[in-house]
């Protein structure tokens, strides 16, 4: 048995990712539509979606007074079966392509309606 020089970590379960937003309900509904997820909490200042009601992690959108002003320090990456079709679908939902200085890459950087960056990846390399 290996002895660690520090206490073993607690058993952690990833509950959710918090997303600051100007309009939690509108942004949460947009992401629910984009991901095909379900709404599990719809309160005035908090709006939570999950892949299924009892499946984690979720996305919890919370109201903040300030607007987003700089590039995200954390963003989500998605790998669809068909990158081109998924980018077209997300654009039709209201996403936008984003140029954050990434240059030509095999992924597409996009933003949601409040300007939060995320990436749509290409096919996984074998």
Model-derived regions, located:
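Vicinal oxygen chelate
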Residues: 1-19, 25, 33, 40-41, ...
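Short, solvent-exposed beta-strand edge segments and adjacent coil->beta transition regions
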Residues: 14-16, 71-75
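Short hydrophobic/aromatic beta-strand micro-patches
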Residues: 18-20, 77-81
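Short, conserved charged micro-motifs
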Residues: 26-28, 82-88
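Residue-level signal for inorganic ion chemistry
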Residues: 31, 76
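Short beta->alpha connector loops
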Residues: 80-82, 103-104
């Amino acid at each position: 048995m290996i002895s660690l020089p520090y206490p073993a970590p607690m058993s952690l379960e990833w509950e959710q990712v918090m997303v600051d937003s100007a309009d939690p309900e509108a942004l949460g509904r947009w992401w629910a539509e984009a991901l095909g997820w379900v709404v599990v909490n719809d309160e005035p200042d908090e709006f939570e979606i999950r892949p299924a009601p009892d499946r984690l992690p979720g996305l919890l959108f919370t109201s903040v007074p300030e607007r987003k002003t700089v590039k995200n320090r954390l963003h989500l990456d998605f790998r669809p079966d068909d990158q081109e079709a998924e980018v077209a679908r997300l654009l039709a939902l209201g996403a936008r392509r984003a140029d954050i200085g990434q240059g030509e890459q095999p992924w597409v950087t996009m933003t949601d309606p409040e300007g939060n960056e995320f990436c749509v990846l290409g096919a996984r390399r074998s």
